[in-house]
């Protein structure tokens, strides 16, 4: 955020409370009185990386659900890789097949669709992450791959994900824990493997 006098503020947290979006900043100078207008700027490289990782996770999770009935029981977008935990074990061959199927969705460059169905429409829909949610539910649909309730940021189409690469898999709590990378991270991982 930039103040009218040019002073820059670093946003350290964003949350919603009572329908108002609050930005917490690292320090607030005396020149920033309540009601002062600020200019916001998004760190696009950081945001786009997170969009690639998150959309790639949706694609792979949806494919694993279709192929093996696997539920995504946890994921974390880390600074190096995305961790995904599945509800069922999946063989190495099954993971190779799922990785290829997920990348085929990327290469098809299908649109990532965002909808806000009514409660009646939602009751008739089949989608992942079907939990009791208060208020409006946002559905992310990636044709051929996934339909899921989600409030995260995504690419506009699957082609922007670039590539999905499974780096590692280990048995974890009756399922499998995957480490994946997408987009530029996948390219950098492939380059590192050649060295």
Predicted stretch roles:
Residues 1-195:
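Active-/binding-site microenvironments in catalytic and ligand-binding cores
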């Amino acid at each position: 955020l930039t103040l009218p006098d040019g002073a820059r503020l670093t946003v350290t947290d964003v949350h919603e409370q009572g329908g108002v979006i609050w930005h917490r900043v690292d320090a607030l100078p005396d020149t920033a009185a309540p009601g002062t207008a600020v200019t916001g700027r998004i760190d696009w490289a950081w945001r786009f990386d997170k969009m690639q990782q998150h959309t790639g996770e949706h694609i792979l999770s949806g494919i694993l659900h279709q192929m093996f009935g696997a539920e995504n029981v946890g994921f974390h977008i880390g600074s190096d890789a995305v961790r995904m935990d599945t509800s069922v074990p999946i063989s190495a061959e099954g993971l190779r097949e799922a990785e290829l199927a997920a990348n085929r969705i990327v290469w098809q460059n299908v649109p990532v669709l965002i909808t806000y169905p009514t409660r009646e429409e939602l009751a008739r829909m089949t989608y992942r992450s079907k939990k009791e949610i208060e208020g409006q539910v946002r559905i992310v649909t990636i044709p051929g791959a996934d339909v899921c309730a989600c409030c995260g940021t995504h690419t506009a189409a699957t082609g922007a994900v670039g590539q999905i690469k499974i780096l590692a898999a280990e048995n974890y709590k009756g399922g499998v824990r995957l480490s994946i990378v997408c987009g530029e991270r996948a390219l950098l991982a492939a380059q590192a493997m050649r060295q």
